[in-house]
Curated annotation (Swiss-Prot):
Keyword flag Coiled coil: yes
This protein's domain notes: The BTB/POZ domain mediates the interaction with some component of ubiquitin ligase complexes.
Name of this chain's protein: BTB/POZ domain-containing protein At4g08455
GO molecular function: ubiquitin protein ligase binding
PANTHER family membership: SPECKLE-TYPE POZ PROTEIN
Length: 243
């Protein structure tokens, strides 16, 4: 028998590879593990400590020089401390806001509209750590904020999460949401779900709401559906001619 790696002859009792290739593969695996561990250590080293971290000392908090306030919460939620340098390095919008003599830069207070305290806190924490605990609502809230403040890494992170939560039941509303916020990855995945389940979804209440509120989306959905039908028919015709 021949080795699947180097194509050299090997004894039949060996499982698919010769001894040399097996040893080499094991060494490569160990090397990759070491590289992964090294990368993890570097990420941990480069991860910025946030004033929102549990156990952060009051000393480190004293070095913050800006606070963010969620204006949606009228119950007097506490301001969220941060560092201008971090906000500026993570967001072009914050950079323009804080490097010029705008009100936020002078006052040291940034009011964020249409966002809950929890969403804003998670957003700021992500800017420091590239970590966020998501559910579907939080992912939507953070995607909106990441688009507004041009935090591309966070937007991609939220999009990937939302795609994993897609189903025929939520595909229509997710499609409308993704369209509104330019979330192309989610948009394409939701459209695929809709097209695959078109016969069921056209009878749903969400579909009728979409017809009334945003008929252009319905046009796009039907264009995608008809395109799929044409491609399917063309594929069937080609197969029958070949046979």
């Amino acid at each position: 028998m021949r080795c699947i790696s180097c194509r050299e002859e090997y004894l039949p009792r060996n499982a698919g590879t010769c001894k040399e290739c097996y040893v080499e593969a094991g060494e490569t695996e160990e090397e990759l593990k070491r590289e992964i561990d090294d990368l993890k250590a570097k990420v941990a080293f480069l991860r910025l400590s946030s004033s929102l971290d549990h156990g952060t000392s009051s000393t480190s908090r004293s070095f913050t020089d800006v606070v963010l306030i969620a204006s949606e919460d009228n119950a007097g939620s506490p301001p969220i401390p941060a560092h201008k340098s971090v906000l500026v390095s993570r967001s072009p919008v914050f950079k323009a806001m804080l490097e010029n003599e705008m009100e936020e830069s002078l006052s040291g207070t940034i009011k964020i509209s249409d966002v809950s305290y929890d969403a804003l806190r998670t957003f700021v924490y992500y800017l420091y750590t590239a970590e966020a605990c998501l559910d579907e609502q939080m992912a939507c809230d953070l995607l909106v904020m990441s688009e507004k403040y041009q935090v591309k890494h966070l937007k991609s992170y939220c999009e990937r999460f939302l795609v994993t939560k897609l189903s025929p039941d939520n595909s229509l509303m997710t499609y409308a949401f993704a369209h509104q916020h330019n979330a192309k990855h989610v948009l394409d995945a939701a459209l695929s779900q809709i097209v695959e389940n078109m016969d069921k979804l056209t009878k749903r209440e969400e579909y009728m709401e979409l017809v009334e509120k945003d008929p252009r989306l319905i046009v796009e959905i039907y264009e995608a559906y008809l395109s799929k039908q044409v491609n399917t028919a063309a594929g069937g015709t080609s197969t029958s001619k070949t046979s």
